[in-house]
């Protein structure tokens, strides 16, 4: 909501784990079609494509920065989301953002150590807007569920994001914390 995406904008999502893939799904339901997914795992990039990423870049097998610049006509993405929790990735995300663009860091929920970047070259010289995301409000859950329902209506395979079978939930030890499973087919 904060970034007010426009038609034709390039939005980059770095990190295609659960957070990045759910974010990709949300951005797609907001009408963004030029989504670039960056990760080092081909399975995750394949899932990103299924969920609506127009482009993917595998930093393990190609120069992802050069590929993103090629995709965006040498400018970079208007918006980049850093979803990895990796200090090394956090130092790279700036290279994907165009002058006057924005970057949202939402991948660090634990202290994974410091990262290195150049405030002059990476932020100030490019006039990048930076925001961190830590938590959410209760109303955000409703909006998130609505976005997932919308994604399902659009034919995006959000159910494939689940990595555990429903039956397995009943077999799990009581002392293990599990994510909440929501069945959108019920309409509630």
How does the language model describe each region?
Residues 85, 107-108:
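Short glycine-/small-residue-rich Rossmann-like dinucleotide-binding loops
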Residues 108-127, 144-146:
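Rossmann-fold NAD(P)-binding glycine/threonine-rich loop
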Residues 9, 101-102:
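Glycine-centered, small-residue-biased loops immediately flanking beta-strands
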Residues 13-16, 28-92:
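Adenosine-nucleotide cofactor-binding segment
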Residues 97-99:
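Helix-to-beta-strand junctions that scaffold the AdoMet/dcAdoMet cofactor pocket
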Residues 41, 109, 136:
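Residues in the short beta-alpha loop(s) of Rossmann-like NAD(P)-binding domains
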